Regions:
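Cytochrome P450
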Residues: 1-140
């Protein structure tokens, strides 16, 4: 997929969106019910906590063809990596712009990126990320 992005840096936005769908930085979110309601056939009272698994929604085979495959050409519109609605991440547009600019610049300047060691994820109940992600970068 890196070769495809190098050939077509204009795919950077799709690469960003597919990456967010495939491996959301915040895989779960929690909300509190404002009033009694029924969710998925379960009756909930006001004030109850509900945890939504965004990562599962982003890999739902009813919505995504081959959901466990990262596909640079996929239209990932509709993923919920940043939540949705009035509670969506306020910084999501900035994050998208930064990631798209970074991928575009890298695609123009870097011929390959390969692992240079084991990634070290940080442990957090609500976020995904890495303390260390060793990589060998070959500049064009």
């Amino acid at each position: 997929t890196w070769a495809a992005l190098r050939e077509a840096p204009s795919l950077a936005r799709r690469a960003c969106e597919e990456g967010l769908r495939w491996n959301a930085p915040s895989p779960v979110i929690a909300r509190t019910t404002a009033r009694p309601c029924v969710l998925g056939g379960v009756a909930l009272e006001a004030g109850e906590k509900v945890v939504m698994d965004l990562a599962a929604a982003n890999r739902d085979p009813r919505r995504w063809t081959e959901p466990d495959v990262y596909d640079l050409t996929r239209d990932a519109t509709g993923h919920v990596a940043f939540g949705t609605g009035i509670h969506g991440c306020v910084g999501q547009m900035m994050a998208r712009m930064e990631a798209t600019c970074l991928l575009t610049a890298l695609a123009r300047r870097v011929t390959s990126i390969t692992p240079a060691g084991e990634p070290v994820p940080f442990i957090n109940n609500w976020l995904r990320g890495y303390e260390s992600l060793p990589a060998h970068v070959e500049v064009a």
